[in-house]
UniProtKB/Swiss-Prot annotation:
Protein name as it appears in the record: Ribosomal RNA small subunit methyltransferase I
Species whose genome carries this gene: Pseudomonas aeruginosa (strain ATCC 15692 / DSM 22644 / CIP 104116 / JCM 14847 / LMG 12228 / 1C / PRS 101 / PAO1)
Enzyme class of the recorded protein, top EC level: transferase
Gene of this entry: rsmI
GO cellular component: cytoplasm
Protein purpose: Catalyzes the 2'-O-methylation of the ribose of cytidine 1402 (C1402) in 16S rRNA.
Catalytic activity from the UniProt record: cytidine(1402) in 16S rRNA + S-adenosyl-L-methionine = 2'-O-methylcytidine(1402) in 16S rRNA + S-adenosyl-L-homocysteine + H(+)
Pfam families named among the record's database cross-references: RsmI_C (PF23016), TP_methylase (PF00590)
Family the UniProt entry places it in: Belongs to the methyltransferase superfamily. RsmI family.
Keyword Cytoplasm applies: yes
Keywords linked to the UniProt accession: Cytoplasm, Methyltransferase, rRNA processing, S-adenosyl-L-methionine, Transferase
Amino acid sequence: MSAGTLFVVATPIGNLDDISPRALRVLREVALVAAEDTRHSIRLFQHFGIETPLAACHEHNEREEGGRFISRLQGGEDVALISDAGTPLISDPGFHLVRQAQALGIRVVPVPGSCALIAALSAAGLPSDRFIFEGFLPAKAAGRRSRLQAVQEEPRTLIFYEAPHRLLESLADMRDVFGGERRAVLARELSKTFETIRSLPLAELHDWVASDSNQQRGECVVLVAGWQAPEGEESIGAEALRVLDLLLAELPLKKAAALAAEITGVRKNLLYQQALQRQGKS
Protein backbone atom coordinates (compact mmCIF):
# COMPACT_ATOMS: atom_id res chain seq x y z
CA MET A 1 0.00 0.00 0.00
CA SER A 2 1.35 3.40 -0.95
CA ALA A 3 1.45 6.15 1.66
CA GLY A 4 -0.94 9.07 1.62
CA THR A 5 -0.04 12.71 1.07
CA LEU A 6 0.47 15.41 3.68
CA PHE A 7 -1.02 18.66 2.37
CA VAL A 8 0.25 21.89 3.98
CA VAL A 9 -2.74 24.18 3.48
CA ALA A 10 -2.78 27.96 3.86
CA THR A 11 -5.97 29.46 5.29
CA PRO A 12 -7.15 33.10 5.41
CA ILE A 13 -5.50 35.56 7.80
CA GLY A 14 -8.74 37.51 8.10
CA ASN A 15 -10.98 37.77 5.06
CA LEU A 16 -12.50 34.35 4.41
CA ASP A 17 -12.86 35.15 0.71
CA ASP A 18 -9.08 34.77 0.43
CA ILE A 19 -9.21 30.98 0.70
CA SER A 20 -8.59 29.22 -2.60
CA PRO A 21 -10.92 26.71 -4.29
CA ARG A 22 -8.06 24.21 -4.21
CA ALA A 23 -7.64 24.62 -0.44
CA LEU A 24 -11.36 24.02 0.09
CA ARG A 25 -11.28 20.93 -2.12
CA VAL A 26 -8.28 19.47 -0.28
CA LEU A 27 -9.79 20.14 3.15
CA ARG A 28 -12.98 18.36 2.08
CA GLU A 29 -11.26 15.36 0.50
CA VAL A 30 -8.56 14.42 3.03
CA ALA A 31 -9.27 11.87 5.75
CA LEU A 32 -8.10 14.09 8.61
CA VAL A 33 -7.05 17.70 9.22
CA ALA A 34 -4.31 18.46 11.75
CA ALA A 35 -5.15 21.90 13.15
CA GLU A 36 -3.27 24.25 15.47
CA ASP A 37 -6.48 24.93 17.44
CA THR A 38 -9.52 22.83 16.59
CA ARG A 39 -11.83 25.29 18.38
CA HIS A 40 -10.67 28.05 16.05
CA SER A 41 -10.66 25.98 12.87
CA ILE A 42 -14.14 24.57 13.44
CA ARG A 43 -15.55 28.04 12.70
CA LEU A 44 -13.81 28.04 9.32
CA PHE A 45 -15.13 24.56 8.61
CA GLN A 46 -18.67 25.48 9.60
CA HIS A 47 -18.58 28.57 7.37
CA PHE A 48 -17.63 26.50 4.32
CA GLY A 49 -19.56 23.36 5.21
CA ILE A 50 -16.45 21.19 5.63
CA GLU A 51 -17.14 18.00 7.60
CA THR A 52 -13.64 16.47 7.68
CA PRO A 53 -12.55 15.42 11.22
CA LEU A 54 -10.15 17.76 13.01
CA ALA A 55 -7.32 16.77 15.37
CA ALA A 56 -5.07 19.07 17.40
CA CYS A 57 -1.49 19.60 16.27
CA HIS A 58 0.12 22.46 18.19
CA GLU A 59 3.46 23.39 19.74
CA HIS A 60 2.70 21.55 23.00
CA ASN A 61 1.74 18.19 21.49
CA GLU A 62 3.29 18.10 18.03
CA ARG A 63 6.24 15.88 18.94
CA GLU A 64 4.08 13.40 20.88
CA GLU A 65 1.05 13.35 18.57
CA GLY A 66 2.97 13.45 15.29
CA GLY A 67 3.10 9.66 15.19
CA ARG A 68 -0.69 9.55 15.06
CA PHE A 69 -0.77 11.54 11.85
CA ILE A 70 2.18 9.64 10.40
CA SER A 71 0.40 6.34 11.04
CA ARG A 72 -2.64 7.54 9.12
CA LEU A 73 -0.41 8.69 6.26
CA GLN A 74 1.50 5.41 6.19
CA GLY A 75 -1.84 3.64 6.09
CA GLY A 76 -2.61 5.33 2.78
CA GLU A 77 -4.79 8.18 4.01
CA ASP A 78 -4.29 11.82 3.04
CA VAL A 79 -3.90 14.37 5.85
CA ALA A 80 -4.01 18.18 5.73
CA LEU A 81 -2.09 20.48 8.07
CA ILE A 82 -3.47 23.95 8.86
CA SER A 83 -2.68 26.71 11.34
CA ASP A 84 -5.11 29.16 12.93
CA ALA A 85 -4.48 31.61 10.10
CA GLY A 86 -2.10 31.91 7.18
CA THR A 87 0.54 29.44 6.06
CA PRO A 88 1.51 26.62 8.48
CA LEU A 89 5.09 26.55 9.83
CA ILE A 90 5.57 30.32 9.32
CA SER A 91 5.88 31.15 13.04
CA ASP A 92 3.31 28.39 13.55
CA PRO A 93 3.46 24.65 14.41
CA GLY A 94 3.98 21.90 11.87
CA PHE A 95 7.74 21.73 11.38
CA HIS A 96 8.24 18.45 13.25
CA LEU A 97 5.37 16.75 11.44
CA VAL A 98 6.60 17.87 8.01
CA ARG A 99 10.18 16.87 8.78
CA GLN A 100 9.09 13.46 10.01
CA ALA A 101 6.97 12.91 6.91
CA GLN A 102 9.85 13.92 4.64
CA ALA A 103 12.24 11.61 6.47
CA LEU A 104 9.88 8.68 5.92
CA GLY A 105 9.46 9.39 2.23
CA ILE A 106 5.87 10.60 2.59
CA ARG A 107 4.88 13.11 -0.08
CA VAL A 108 4.40 16.65 1.28
CA VAL A 109 2.44 19.07 -0.92
CA PRO A 110 2.03 22.81 -0.23
CA VAL A 111 -1.32 24.42 -1.01
CA PRO A 112 -0.33 28.11 -1.18
CA GLY A 113 -2.39 31.02 0.07
CA SER A 114 -2.37 33.82 2.61
CA CYS A 115 0.79 34.71 4.54
CA ALA A 116 0.86 37.83 6.71
CA LEU A 117 4.54 38.61 6.20
CA ILE A 118 4.28 38.46 2.39
CA ALA A 119 1.04 40.45 2.36
CA ALA A 120 2.64 43.12 4.55
CA LEU A 121 5.81 43.26 2.47
CA SER A 122 3.85 43.64 -0.77
CA ALA A 123 2.20 46.83 0.50
CA ALA A 124 4.95 48.27 2.71
CA GLY A 125 6.87 50.29 0.17
CA LEU A 126 10.19 48.89 1.41
CA PRO A 127 12.70 46.98 -0.77
CA SER A 128 11.27 43.51 -1.35
CA ASP A 129 13.94 41.90 -3.54
CA ARG A 130 15.90 40.82 -0.45
CA PHE A 131 14.45 40.47 3.05
CA ILE A 132 14.73 38.40 6.21
CA PHE A 133 11.94 37.18 8.47
CA GLU A 134 12.75 37.13 12.20
CA GLY A 135 9.39 35.83 13.44
CA PHE A 136 8.42 36.86 16.97
CA LEU A 137 11.00 38.68 19.08
CA PRO A 138 11.79 37.38 22.60
CA ALA A 139 9.28 38.47 25.24
CA LYS A 140 11.93 39.74 27.67
CA ALA A 141 13.66 43.05 27.00
CA ALA A 142 17.23 41.72 27.23
CA GLY A 143 16.62 38.94 24.74
CA ARG A 144 14.71 41.24 22.44
CA ARG A 145 17.48 43.85 22.35
CA SER A 146 20.10 41.17 21.79
CA ARG A 147 18.17 39.83 18.78
CA LEU A 148 17.77 43.34 17.36
CA GLN A 149 21.45 44.15 17.86
CA ALA A 150 22.34 41.01 15.90
CA VAL A 151 20.59 42.45 12.82
CA GLN A 152 21.42 46.11 13.44
CA GLU A 153 23.62 46.34 10.34
CA GLU A 154 21.60 43.92 8.20
CA PRO A 155 21.10 45.58 4.77
CA ARG A 156 18.00 43.58 3.87
CA THR A 157 14.45 44.56 4.85
CA LEU A 158 13.63 43.15 8.30
CA ILE A 159 10.22 41.61 9.05
CA PHE A 160 8.92 40.77 12.52
CA TYR A 161 5.68 39.46 13.98
CA GLU A 162 4.69 40.96 17.31
CA ALA A 163 1.98 40.42 19.89
CA PRO A 164 -0.15 43.55 20.39
CA HIS A 165 0.60 43.80 24.12
CA ARG A 166 4.35 43.95 23.39
CA LEU A 167 4.18 46.15 20.28
CA LEU A 168 5.03 49.43 22.01
CA GLU A 169 7.99 47.94 23.90
CA SER A 170 9.36 46.36 20.74
CA LEU A 171 9.04 49.58 18.76
CA ALA A 172 10.89 51.43 21.53
CA ASP A 173 13.71 48.87 21.42
CA MET A 174 13.84 49.07 17.61
CA ARG A 175 14.04 52.84 17.82
CA ASP A 176 16.88 52.66 20.35
CA VAL A 177 18.85 49.95 18.52
CA PHE A 178 18.25 50.91 14.87
CA GLY A 179 17.90 54.66 15.35
CA GLY A 180 14.79 56.80 15.34
CA GLU A 181 15.20 57.85 11.70
CA ARG A 182 15.14 54.30 10.29
CA ARG A 183 12.03 53.84 8.13
CA ALA A 184 9.53 51.30 9.44
CA VAL A 185 6.04 50.07 8.64
CA LEU A 186 3.31 48.75 10.91
CA ALA A 187 0.92 46.42 9.09
CA ARG A 188 -1.93 45.54 11.45
CA GLU A 189 -5.09 43.44 11.09
CA LEU A 190 -4.36 42.67 7.43
CA SER A 191 -7.43 41.83 5.33
CA LYS A 192 -9.70 42.59 8.29
CA THR A 193 -12.11 45.47 8.96
CA PHE A 194 -9.57 47.64 10.78
CA GLU A 195 -6.59 46.97 8.51
CA THR A 196 -3.86 49.56 9.02
CA ILE A 197 -0.62 50.05 7.11
CA ARG A 198 1.44 52.99 8.38
CA SER A 199 4.95 53.98 7.25
CA LEU A 200 7.01 56.38 9.41
CA PRO A 201 10.50 56.75 10.86
CA LEU A 202 10.78 54.47 13.90
CA ALA A 203 10.65 57.27 16.46
CA GLU A 204 7.48 58.70 14.91
CA LEU A 205 5.92 55.26 14.47
CA HIS A 206 6.48 54.50 18.16
CA ASP A 207 4.91 57.80 19.22
CA TRP A 208 1.97 57.32 16.87
CA VAL A 209 1.22 53.87 18.28
CA ALA A 210 1.66 55.18 21.83
CA SER A 211 -0.90 57.93 21.19
CA ASP A 212 -3.61 55.57 19.91
CA SER A 213 -4.44 52.46 21.92
CA ASN A 214 -6.41 51.08 18.96
CA GLN A 215 -3.09 50.53 17.19
CA GLN A 216 -2.04 48.21 20.01
CA ARG A 217 -4.64 45.59 19.13
CA GLY A 218 -4.87 42.69 16.71
CA GLU A 219 -2.29 40.87 14.61
CA CYS A 220 0.82 42.96 13.93
CA VAL A 221 3.63 42.80 11.39
CA VAL A 222 6.50 45.27 11.75
CA LEU A 223 8.82 45.88 8.81
CA VAL A 224 12.04 47.87 9.11
CA ALA A 225 14.22 49.17 6.31
CA GLY A 226 17.61 47.52 6.09
CA TRP A 227 20.73 49.28 7.31
CA GLN A 228 22.44 51.61 4.87
CA ALA A 229 26.07 52.57 5.20
CA PRO A 230 26.73 56.31 5.51
CA GLU A 231 27.40 57.91 2.15
CA GLY A 232 30.87 57.03 0.94
CA GLU A 233 31.16 54.10 3.36
CA GLU A 234 30.94 50.54 2.05
CA SER A 235 28.43 48.22 3.72
CA ILE A 236 29.67 44.97 5.25
CA GLY A 237 26.37 43.36 6.20
CA ALA A 238 25.24 41.41 9.24
CA GLU A 239 26.11 37.95 7.90
CA ALA A 240 29.69 38.95 7.05
CA LEU A 241 30.07 40.47 10.52
CA ARG A 242 28.78 37.27 12.09
CA VAL A 243 31.35 35.24 10.12
CA LEU A 244 34.08 37.68 11.13
CA ASP A 245 33.16 37.44 14.82
CA LEU A 246 33.22 33.64 14.72
CA LEU A 247 36.64 33.61 13.10
CA LEU A 248 38.04 36.26 15.47
CA ALA A 249 37.19 33.95 18.36
CA GLU A 250 39.48 31.25 16.92
CA LEU A 251 42.14 32.96 14.77
CA PRO A 252 44.59 35.86 14.84
CA LEU A 253 43.08 39.10 13.60
CA LYS A 254 44.77 39.21 10.19
CA LYS A 255 43.98 35.57 9.39
CA ALA A 256 40.39 35.99 10.54
CA ALA A 257 39.88 39.00 8.27
CA ALA A 258 41.45 37.24 5.28
CA LEU A 259 39.37 34.09 5.71
CA ALA A 260 36.19 36.10 6.30
CA ALA A 261 36.85 37.96 3.04
CA GLU A 262 37.28 34.67 1.19
CA ILE A 263 34.03 33.28 2.63
CA THR A 264 31.82 36.36 2.26
CA GLY A 265 33.27 38.19 -0.73
CA VAL A 266 33.64 41.42 1.26
CA ARG A 267 36.92 43.28 0.73
CA LYS A 268 39.68 42.06 3.06
CA ASN A 269 40.79 45.56 4.02
CA LEU A 270 37.25 46.51 5.02
CA LEU A 271 36.94 43.43 7.22
CA TYR A 272 40.40 44.03 8.66
CA GLN A 273 39.42 47.56 9.73
CA GLN A 274 36.21 46.21 11.24
CA ALA A 275 38.18 43.54 13.11
CA LEU A 276 40.46 46.21 14.55
CA GLN A 277 37.44 48.13 15.81
CA ARG A 278 35.89 45.00 17.31
CA GLN A 279 39.07 44.21 19.22
CA GLY A 280 39.58 47.80 20.30
CA LYS A 281 42.80 48.26 18.34
CA SER A 282 41.71 51.02 15.96
